[in-house]
Amino acid sequence: VARSVRLVPTLPAASLLACALVLSACGGGVHGTPGGSGVRDPYFPKAGNGGYDVTHYGLRLAYDPGARHLTGTAVLTARAEKDLSAFNLDLLGMEVEKVTVGGEIARWNRAGQELTVRPHGDIGRDATFRVTVRYSGTPETVTDPDGSQEGWLRTADGVLALGEPTGSMAWFPGNHHPSDKAAYDLAVTVPEGLHAVSNGELRSERTARGSTTFVWHSGEPMASYLATLAIGRFDISRSRAGDLPLYTAVDPAEAAASRPVLGRIPEVLRWSERRFGPYPFSSAGAIVDSAASVGYALETQTRPVFPGAPDMTLLVHELAHQWYGDSVTPESWRDMWLNEGFATYAEWLWEEDHGGAGAQKTFDEVYSGASFDTEEAAEEIWEFPPADPPGAGQISDPPVYVRGAMVLQKVRQAVGDDRFFSILRGWAATYRHGNADTADFTAYVEKQAPGTDLEAVWDEWLYGEGKPEQP
């Protein structure tokens, strides 16, 4: 693994005083310890970092598609969760040029994806501090354990940045684990004629001297894997769903095919609000952009990304994630079924509410194998329990999606429709803009359905190995 080290000489005592004034935490008798790399995620042990919580990312980027060169300044505002002598950020590749903490030059070194920062003085527990990283280079494409690609992905006329599960570290430094959510402000400068599309609301768009700067704001907390950036030529559509602003950006080659389905975003949002509760964000929309190496859609917050014109099933799935996955975000990657099982069940509910098969019929056909084209596909969903994928390469496999949805149908069978739909809405409301794990979900359901025996649902469908004997 390539290593680089940058050591900065010790600053004079006057700088210590300046640091104390800026941080309200440096020196002053604080004796911290390093925050550490990783947060002990069972599948991505190096993802995220200990000792602090990021509350805001301020990213200022400039991208030259011809040279494939990105220049960035990242300003992270964070709160120390312990006394810190050092802390880590996740950043893959790129050349780090300068790091400051509270405006004071900090020492730093790199090893793989870990950028270790040593502020001039220790940071006290509960103190708010600001770290600024200047960096540049050609961001990398990341290959997942399952073979899919993410990170910084080239398109015909620009790039597409996708982050699930760890790709965002390819284009900005951060605490890249779903358990740390933050607000974002992103300013991106690109050659005139190109658009830069991200999450949240477009605050401004200014062109000068052959370049255009787009400024995006995401006020609601967002896990970094849900951050996106699409640079290229797009057909832009601005509209509203009631009071909610919609912004869609579509590759011109996909515009005609995408228009009929994307035009139904307001309808899907209205239906979703009836089923899942109030929409959790202040804007919505979609991005349709094609990177040759990407064959999947992703629920990037407020603005899902589709690799081509979506159908209704895919649109319903990705918009359902705005409640389940984006607003209620998994505590760790082991809890992915709370994303994908819920979004898959949303597909079943959409069919049920729009003249198609009921969710119970869909469940029965999945259980019998009738809904699959091959016997192999029918057997795949029983390879492991949805709440316990065997490894990082399986967190997006069929059991997480389909068997995860089956768990919800079993809960519905056990508690009845009225209580079940109350649980769906209440779960989204209780953990709105937060994190939750599987134990939180089972406890929540049991609290909402006192006296209901759910042991078999959890033991056989959620955690059990193999195919349960009875549907």
Annotate each predicted stretch with a short phrase.
Residues T73-E95, F172-H176, A183-P191, A439:
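Surface-exposed beta-strand/loop patches in extracellular or lumenal glycoproteins
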Residues L91-L153:
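A surface-exposed beta-strand-loop module
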